[in-house]
Amino acid sequence: MSAISRDEVAHLARLARLALTDAELDGYAGQLDAILGHVSQISAVSTDELDEVDATSSPLDAVNVTRPDVIAECLTPEEALAAAPRVAEGRFAVPQILGEEE
């Protein structure tokens, strides 16, 4: 017997506001039934031995890789603004997007 019926798929489709054809309802019912079968198999796996295994967040001994924080030359404000299409009061000028009437 199927774990999920065509009517249940139709109900889920209505809840999700999806318009499905009869063929799609039948197809999805079969696909969801197969998925639920796989979930059932996974749920049946014994986890008794897992109590002996320490929990880990990562199986790798990865560490943060960083470069030295060295002070270096950077652009002057004039150099940074030189290629800007518009500048206002020593800043990049961009079109206003907030507070405008629609």
Swiss-Prot record:
Keywords annotated in UniProt: ATP-binding, Ligase, Nucleotide-binding, Protein biosynthesis
Cited InterPro entries: Asp/Glu-ADT_sf_sub_c, GatC
Catalytic reaction(s) noted: L-glutamyl-tRNA(Gln) + L-glutamine + ATP + H2O = L-glutaminyl-tRNA(Gln) + L-glutamate + ADP + phosphate + H(+); L-aspartyl-tRNA(Asn) + L-glutamine + ATP + H2O = L-asparaginyl-tRNA(Asn) + L-glutamate + ADP + phosphate + 2 H(+)
One GO-annotated biological process of the protein: translation
Enzyme class: ligase
Domain of life, per lineage: Bacteria
An MF annotation (GO) of this entry: glutaminyl-tRNA synthase (glutamine-hydrolyzing) activity
EC numbers for this chain: 6.3.5.-
Subunit details: Heterotrimer of A, B and C subunits.
Biological function: Allows the formation of correctly charged Asn-tRNA(Asn) or Gln-tRNA(Gln) through the transamidation of misacylated Asp-tRNA(Asn) or Glu-tRNA(Gln) in organisms which lack either or both of asparaginyl-tRNA or glutaminyl-tRNA synthetases. The reaction takes place in the presence of glutamine and ATP through an activated phospho-Asp-tRNA(Asn) or phospho-Glu-tRNA(Gln).
Similarity section: Belongs to the GatC family.
The protein's name: Aspartyl/glutamyl-tRNA(Asn/Gln) amidotransferase subunit C
